[in-house]
Amino acid sequence: MPRDAGRHGERQVRPARLRRFYEKTCDSGTVRTAYRCRAYPDEQQQAMLRRTFGCVRVVWNRTLAQRRARWHLERTGTSYAETDRALTAMKKDPDLAFLNQVSSVPLQQALRHQHQAFRGFFAGRARYPRFKSRAGRQSAHYTRSAFSLRGGVLRLAKAASPLRFTWTWPDIDVTALDPAMVIVSLESDGRWYVTFTVDTQAPEPLPQTGRAVGVDLGVKDFAVTSDGQRIANPRHLERRAQNLARYQRRLARCQNGSANRAKAKAKVARAHRKVRNVRQDFLHRASTRLVRENDIIVIEDLHVAGMVRNRRLARAISDCGWGEFRRQLEYKCQRYGRELVVIDRWYPSSKTCSACGHLLAELSLSTRHWTCPSCRARHDRDINAAQNIRAAGRAVARDAPGDACGGDVRHSGSSRVQSPANQEPQPARAGIPVFQGGE
């Protein structure tokens, strides 16, 4: 399917939709929060949930195949209503009678998610939707009509007994929880999780500090701030690379389809999970500290997908988690009344003297310190870049003050090339997502 098809129509309506969404979010004073905790289904529940996962995959893959075939044959799209009618026809098919053995809600949600995925694709925010495999993470989404949570006891549709889970938030009363959606998932390492999506009261904005900070992200140091602080790069994957490689070699030696291969695959998945967890913890600590200590946070719109094409730096860049760090800054600034400004990726922050504004013609990546030929000021490359980022961000914030919801950023898909002569780029600005959690 061509990437440009329908994109202009989506772009015309998307700003209005975003504006209505964030106005509603701010006016209502609520934010959507996801609480993810371990689940412990018994054997009967596991069998029921695995059947549900399989039915979700069948519905998703068949619907996606029908969308692709219709586009290639007729050059027309497929609406959600048409996929809903197709699901009804699937349930009447004798070969697909097993679809009636599970709750219909996860199947309907699969259609909704696919419809949203195509909207994101046509708007240029996501890749083309792919077919689902039984080898990856599995999940089923239940809305209010398909579950009940009373007194901390969770019951799912088509389940004969309550689903046992461990609540890990002692300051939140699970018996008073009123989730809008429950997501049951099975990770590749064999762990079960249940996620409660709840609309909660928005927290009070943090007290003003009067501080603004520019953040220069890198590989040698994860981040350098405009006030000279350096956040060391812990290199989580590199520290555990030997252990992970050992498990991967064992997996490669196992025969396909064997029980030993399944065990080895689970060990590889567990090793990846440990790396992912420590990275998430580090990013949360770093982002929370910046949000607490500063009113305005300025970062660059890094093109991570393009940067990882460098084979020598791809693993190190991916290990940093810059995209996840930005996502956390976005929703935390939104929630706690801070302002996040994202300046253009082409802004020459490293080559510009933060003292006099002189712009160097060239500056190699290996040059970590340099002297300005105009004012003779001596610069640390990263600190100078962070100071220029802060100056550009404060100019943007001054010219386009944030809305009542807190942070303002430009959406990652709308960067514009700035001339090096324009040292204060004016990026387009959009709202910040308020969703939290890994689901």
Which positions does each model-derived feature cover?
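Substrate-contacting helices/loops that form the catalytic groove of nucleic-acid
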Residues: A65, A69-L96, N100, L177-M181, ...
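Hydrophobic residues embedded in beta-strands of well-ordered beta-sheets
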Residues: F147, G152-R155, R191-V194, F222-A223, ...
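Secondary-structure transition/turn motif
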Residues: V153-R164, F196-Q201, G228-Q229, S374-R376
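Acidic carboxylate diad motif detector
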Residues: Y80-E187
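Short acidic-glycine loop/turn motifs at beta-strand connectors
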Residues: R150, E187-D189, S226-Q229, A355-C356, ...
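Positively charged, low-complexity nucleic-acid-binding target-recognition regions
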Residues: P2-S28, R32, A316, C320-E439
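Gly/serine-rich nucleotide phosphate-binding loop at the start of the catalytic core
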Residues: P2-P106
